[in-house]
Regions:
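Catalytic phosphate/metal-binding cores of nucleic-acid and nucleotide-processing enzymes, i.e., regions
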Residues: 1-120
């Protein structure tokens, strides 16, 4: 398929927007960019479709806040959505990579902390 680019879905809060202040409202993105994520997205877009996924985008003001935040940092993406699209990979700060082994999965869930709270 000429021109086909596989989709990469990237979570907004905690992956792009550092989210160190926590939830302030759908239209509020007060925290800085996660260092280097702009360059990663730019690189991925050479051969992938990049879609930003966030429950924040369910509200019009949230979708606009994401759009404005990306524009502020000169980040171009292929879409913003509130639902997870079919993708080859999902980049999320609140995920456990399932390896097919369920032995310690419940324990991993109980002990999980996103990178923004690891020191707490």
């Amino acid at each position: 398929m000429a021109g086909y680019r596989p989709t990469v879905a990237i979570d907004f809060d905690g992956v792009i927007h550092s989210y160190t202040s926590g939830w302030q409202g759908a239209d509020q993105c007060p925290d800085p960019l996660v260092e280097g994520i702009d360059e990663v997205i730019k690189d991925l877009r050479k051969d992938h479709k990049v879609v930003i996924v966030s429950s924040r985008a369910e509200a019009v003001e949230g979708r606009l806040a994401i759009r404005d935040y990306l524009k502020k940092y000169n980040i171009e993406v292929d879409g913003i959505d509130c639902k997870k699209p079919p993708a080859i990979v999902y980049i999320d700060d609140r995920a456990i990579c399932f390896t097919g082994d369920t032995n310690n999965l419940a324990e991993q869930v109980r002990n999980f902390k996103p990178w923004t709270t690891k020191d707490e």
